């Protein structure tokens, strides 16, 4: 079977966790390759809801291996908490089911303090960070002064690095008008204990995955956030601190580009965004509030209400291009049931001209207004439907129009929250 990358094709929160959970049955290994616990995957299986922030969604499938790659930044407190919660639910019965990279960087208390202090200092220019220390941790990684999982396994090395890095953090926080209250010896003992808790899962992930491929195992790479939040290709600076696009899947786990055979982009049937930044199709009216309520658009990590709007075909086409998408899975199609008309942005109006591609400058995007194409809505409930032909004609027409505008096939539609409430037209693991 091929190896498949799943990435968000919008601004995150597209429902990647559900699709990964569905596709895991066809894979042997699920790999997380970037981001941290600023991402939240909400899974509903048999009516039971599980929210994961670090461990890949596939962990709910017995017999599947889940990998956290070197490109992920890990809050060890969160990782241990998720392990304990999963075990309490009867999942993760085999410790060999979870593999954690020794080279993944660690989120420390000062990263969170710096994250919050900076956001407060920015005033109206806030980016909308979750305050979980993701950005400062990636900064330390690039500056070559970060701590990695392997550092937690050597208490003497950990103590030395904590002393050095905490001093730098105090200086930065002082400049921001904040303080770092830290008992360094206690912190070292706590993080050494966390290191012992995760030591049984920690290994060289590159070697582990290479051997899995040699054994003929298939991989499912699970992205976090979305294309429009990529640090290089998103609406900078209103982005996350890592590369969220498909090209980073192999970089974030120690494999080469030939390991990827298929790239699946996940897009809602409408759109949402959390935090600041340009969002041309945003609806600040009753329709936007209706989408928010029907779609349950509140962050799995922060609980913040998401900004909502109609589907943006320009943004989706951009995601197709920068990820090299092979296909799209459309989620929350059921949320659009009951709307008299549904709209798709097919262009942007700017200074009297109509653009058919998304500008690369976010300040220019801010000045754009959407040009909409309207399609008739449908009233039929979709949750019980399981095949493409079962969908109401108007719902099928909507999906087909999105497919035409995006330039790639819509290979699946989610029609409800539960894993089983999905119509799979083409299985990426069986595609030729």
Swiss-Prot record:
EC numbers on record: 6.3.4.4
Annotated protein name in UniProt: Adenylosuccinate synthetase
Alphabetized CDD domains for the sequence: AdSS (cd03108)
Pfam families the record matches: Adenylsucc_synt
Task of the protein: Plays an important role in the de novo pathway of purine nucleotide biosynthesis. Catalyzes the first committed step in the biosynthesis of AMP from IMP.
Gene3D superfamilies (alphabetical): Adenylosuccinate Synthetase, subunit A, domain 1, Adenylosuccinate Synthetase, subunit A, domain 2, Adenylosuccinate Synthetase, subunit A, domain 3
Similarity annotation: Belongs to the adenylosuccinate synthetase family.
Residues binding substrate, per UniProt: 300-306
Matching PROSITE patterns: ADENYLOSUCCIN_SYN_1, ADENYLOSUCCIN_SYN_2
SUPFAM superfamilies: P-loop containing nucleoside triphosphate hydrolases
Pathway connected to this protein: Purine metabolism; AMP biosynthesis via de novo pathway; AMP from IMP: step 1/2
GO cellular component: a single term: cytoplasm
Binding sites annotated in the UniProt record for IMP: 13-16, 38-41, 130, 144, 225, 240, 304
Gene giving rise to this polypeptide: purA
Active site: 13 (proton acceptor), 41 (proton donor)
SMART domains: Adenylsucc_synt
Organism of derivation: Anaeromyxobacter sp. (strain K)
Cofactor: Mg(2+)
PANTHER family, A to Z: ADENYLOSUCCINATE SYNTHETASE
GO biological process: 'de novo' AMP biosynthetic process; IMP metabolic process
GO molecular-function term, one example from the UniProt record: GTP binding
Positions contributing to Mg(2+) binding: 13, 40
Catalyzed reactions: IMP + L-aspartate + GTP = N(6)-(1,2-dicarboxyethyl)-AMP + GDP + phosphate + 2 H(+)
Main location (coarse class): cytoplasm
Positions that bind GTP: 12-18, 40-42, 306, 332-334, 414-416
Key words, A-Z: Cytoplasm, GTP-binding, Ligase, Magnesium, Metal-binding, Nucleotide-binding, Purine biosynthesis
Cofactor binding note of this UniProt entry: Binds 1 Mg(2+) ion per subunit.
